[in-house]
């Protein structure tokens, strides 16, 4: 079985909340992840994990077959970038308060919106919120850089 220590990229829901009458826009389509060994972006499923994304793109062998899991121990030692683009309506842009909300970022990650660092996450077991009103545009890009939890812990 794949070790739970690996980088499990879990975005249960990345959403935008705009106040007034609460409006919610779920951002779980169009995600891609960057595979450094191939210097290429690949399709990703959010919510999901890096292991399932690598498997669905045929970049790793089935970890449940034979001793393949032993050959996949490198995955939790890598950093992984995930990104997507999304648009918001003029109505949302006019709202006074707009937040980006993540339920489950595993574990160490920097979150960027339109190239600006919003926050750094260090705990998967909480909700993360950021005021995005100052950087939100009609067309936007989120980039999430996940750092190897194993490497972080080993460096302490």
Predicted segments with their positions:
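General helical structural elements
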Residues: 7-8, 55, 130
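Intrinsic disorder/low-structure terminal segments
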Residues: 7-12, 41, 64, 85
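Short, solvent-exposed beta-strand/turn "edge" segments of beta-rich domains on protein surfaces
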Residues: 72-76
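A subset of signal/propeptide-processing and intrinsically disordered low-complexity segments
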Residues: 12-14, 48, 57, 71, ...
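Accessory beta-strand-rich segments of carbohydrate-active enzymes
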Residues: 23-34, 77-156
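Accessory carbohydrate-binding/adhesion or oligomerization-edge regions at the termini
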Residues: 19-67, 141-156
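Bacterial Sec-dependent N-terminal signal peptides
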Residues: 1-23
């Amino acid at each position: 079985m794949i070790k739970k220590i690996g980088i499990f990229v879990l975005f249960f829901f990345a959403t935008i909340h705009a106040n007034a009458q609460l409006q919610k826009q779920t951002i779980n389509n169009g995600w891609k992840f960057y595979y450094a060994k191939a210097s290429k972006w690949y399709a990703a499923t959010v919510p999901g994990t890096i292991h399932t994304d690598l498997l669905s793109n045929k970049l790793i062998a089935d970890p449940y077959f034979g001793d393949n899991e032993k050959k996949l121990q490198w995955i939790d030692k890598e950093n992984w970038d995930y990104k997507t683009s999304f648009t918001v309506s003029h109505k949302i842009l006019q709202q006074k308060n707009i937040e980006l909300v993540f339920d489950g970022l595993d574990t160490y990650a920097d979150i960027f919106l339109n190239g600006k660092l919003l926050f750094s996450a260090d705990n998967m077991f909480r909700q993360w919120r950021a005021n995005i009103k100052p950087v939100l545009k009609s067309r936007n890009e989120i980039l999430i850089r996940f750092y190897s939890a194993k490497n972080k812990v080993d460096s302490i």
